[in-house]
A protein has these predicted regions:
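Boundary at the C-terminal end of the N-terminal hydrophobic targeting segment
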Residues: 2-9
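Ligand-binding face of N-terminal immunoglobulin V-set domains in extracellular IgSF glycoproteins
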Residues: 94
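Thiol-based oxidoreductase modules, predominantly thioredoxin-like and allied folds used
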Residues: 48-74, 88
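Short, conserved sequence motifs used for protein processing/export or organelle targeting and
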Residues: 67-87, 100-227
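Short, solvent-exposed loop/turn and secondary-structure capping segments
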Residues: 34-37, 63-65, 105-107
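Extracytoplasmic
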Residues: 17-19, 46-49, 89-91, 146, ...
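Solvent-exposed loop/turn segments at secondary-structure junctions
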Residues: 27-31, 56-61, 100-103
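Local sequence-structure signature of Cys/Sec-based thiol-disulfide redox active-site neighborhoods
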Residues: 13-54
Length: 227
């Protein structure tokens, strides 16, 4: 996998393009998620890929409350389920660039989705920060139904959590790029628009920020800004 990392970060003419966004929906209470967690751990070190771990809360009833889960993360996965006309929610699930998904963590399958997204991606509208307090999304082609602007704050370090109850009782779960905050900044209709960024709170220390411009209701990723 590492051998293709640099190639992924470059377009057909050798210039650097935006990263492919890989989202993992997982749970510390999911007995089948260890391989997916490990895969994202590896992808987090690759150039040309923004790997994000979203902890869902709907497995908490099994006896262990996921320490990173939030209902808005489950709602994001639900939007993908509806957009892609899937039969139900499942973990682990990997969504690549908002375009394609894979239930499970079969490495070759995920690699294929990433490579396809790399071939198909475009840089999209320009995203830029102004005085670290505002985001400006430039003009561009508006997708049918419009688009949403999302702020994602995630922990780039590895987190090891020992599960004390449920199916994974006694196991230590290692997770990377765990999303801690997901905020919808507003809609985008194709014209240049400015958005106010939420201020960094005490819980934001050590977190990285990504801005995702995404077709509405769980659509494809149009542009990405990282800081």
């Amino acid at each position: 996998m590492a051998g293709t990392a640099e190639a992924r970060s470059r377009g057909p003419h050798g210039h650097h393009e935006r990263p492919v966004v890989v989202e993992l929906f997982t749970s510390q209470g999911c007995s089948a998620c260890a391989a997916a967690d490990k895969l994202v751990d590896q992808l987090a070190d690759e150039n040309g890929v923004l790997a994000l771990t979203f902890a869902v809360d709907y497995w908490d009833y099994l006896g262990w409350n996921d320490t990173f889960a939030k209902p808005e993360f489950s709602a994001r996965q639900k939007a993908y389920e509806q957009r892609m006309a899937l039969r139900d929610l499942s973990t682990p699930q990997i969504v690549v660039d908002g375009r394609s998904q894979l239930a499970g963590a079969e490495t070759k399958g995920v690699e294929a989705l990433i490579e396809r997204a790399q071939r198909d991606r475009s840089d999209g509208p320009r995203l830029r920060l102004v005085r670290r307090s505002h985001l400006v999304v430039g003009p561009g082609a508006r997708p049918a139904g419009g688009a949403d602007v999302w702020l994602v704050r995630y922990d780039p370090s590895a987190r090891n959590v020992t599960v004390k109850r449920g199916d994974n009782r006694g196991q230590t779960i290692r997770e990377r790029n765990v999303v801690r905050q997901l905020v919808r900044l507003g809609s985008w209709t194709g014209r240049e628009k400015s958005y106010v960024l939420p201020t960094d709170g005490p819980d934001s220390a050590g977190l990285k920020t990504a801005i995702l411009l995404q077709a509405a209701k769980g659509g494809r990723i149009l542009a990405v800004l990282q800081r």
